[in-house]
Regions:
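Phosphate-binding/switch region of NTP-binding enzymes
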Residues: 171-217
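Cytosolic-facing regulatory segments adjacent to core modules
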Residues: 2-132
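Loop/turn-to-beta-strand initiation segments
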Residues: 7, 70-73, 135-139, 179-185
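A short acidic (Asp/Glu
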Residues: 19-25, 150-153, 195-198
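Flexible beta-alpha connector loops of hexameric P-loop NTPases
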Residues: 74, 152-165, 196-202
Length: 217
């Protein structure tokens, strides 16, 4: 809808920005022309991976689609730790919205600059936050969270993978949701072992075992 503004901040921890864009081009070619063109083919890698002139023309046609995609989806592939992702999104919040005090009065520009600089006491007057656009939906998509760089604990030791993911979800994602109204979406992969068909004692396939479950994450 025209009165809704959507931004998706896609923290791609597994694929580079280039690969995500090439994947979208591949999807475009299949959706519109039913052509299966892999990322490897788009990169013209391999002895026989040459693209015919017709497909090259169709790839150029995808430019408008890709630009529209990138207008909404901001691909970030160089920010990888929980605190770094939080700081990145906090800076986004500073640029697209405003803080108010308990009386509903917008904080001054100078007060906002003090908040951005994280000066002592700068955040004491903050009561709530609003995006400048009244219906601005901001999705923070992290794919996938088991690839997060391990965070340092308050004692200075490195957290485990589980502790890092827990800190990201329970501390930073909740803060982004509650303070700024952002929408965190965390992707977690199913282990490959759970994708194998399992059978019951009679040898019959147990299809329910293929459904995602906590023990397979």
């Amino acid at each position: 809808q025209d009165d809704i503004k959507l931004d998706i901040y896609y923290f791609s921890l597994e694929e580079s920005r280039e690969k995500v864009i090439l994947s979208e081009i591949s999807k475009y070619l299949f959706s519109k022309y039913r052509k299966r063109v892999s990322i490897k083919q788009l990169l013209s890698r391999g002895r026989y991976n040459t693209i015919d002139p017709e497909t090259i023309k169709q790839i150029h046609e995808a430019r408008d689609y890709i630009n529209q995609f990138l207008d909404v989806v901001k691909i970030i592939d160089n920010v990888r730790s929980p605190s770094a992702i939080f700081n990145y999104m906090q800076n986004v919040a500073y640029n697209i919205g405003t803080f108010f005090d308990s009386q509903g009065v917008e904080l001054s520009r100078q007060e906002h600059e003090r908040i951005k600089a994280d000066l002592p006491g700068a955040k004491d007057k903050i009561s709530y936050y609003r995006t400048t656009h009244p219906r601005h939906y901001v999705i923070v998509l992290t794919d996938h969270i088991s690839l997060l760089y391990n965070e340092k604990s308050p004692t200075g030791s490195m957290m485990s993978q589980w502790e890092t993911m827990s800190t990201f979800s329970n501390k930073y994602c909740i803060s982004l949701r509650d303070k700024y109204g952002f929408i965190p979406v965390n992707v977690q992969q199913q282990t490959s072992a759970k994708e194998q068909v399992e059978s019951n004692f009679r040898g019959a396939s147990v299809t329910e075992k293929l459904e995602p479950s906590l023990d397979g994450l």
